[in-house]
């Protein structure tokens, strides 16, 4: 999770999940850049790789603050770190995925994994982030005190 300190607060960079299932959703549709990895890949290495795959930008260098793990409603376990840095959301070139759309149409369409990213203050981020991932925001806030 990329974060910055404008003024006296904290902002985090979150991505809005792409594809037609998320197009009209806001609450619960924002996430830290993330992805799956195999047991033989270190989680930190996977986190950096997924940042690049999802945003199309090199992951920032800097001190990695471990934020631990959360279990999402779908059962997936997400491990996250926070790194202080800055980037222009307009600079992202998101990775894509393919799915049949519309359903049962036989047509395969490509969609961005993340359709946009934004810097959000912690209060706004808590309103829209995937519910389980809100714990990462709390842990970052605690670390930053």
Would you name each region that the model predicts?
Residues 118, 122-145:
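Charged phosphate-binding loop/patch that engages nucleotide di/tri-phosphates or the phosphate backbone
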Residues 1-31, 81:
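N-terminal strand-loop-strand
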Residues 32-67, 121:
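The catalytic Nudix box helix
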Residues 24, 40, 128:
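Residues that scaffold the ATP/ADP-binding catalytic core of kinase and kinase-like folds
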Residues 27, 32, 61, 74-78, ...:
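Short connector loops at helix/strand junctions that flank enzyme active sites
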Residues 6-9, 19-22, 38-39, 74-75, ...:
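Short, charged/polar surface micro-motifs in flexible loops or helix N-caps
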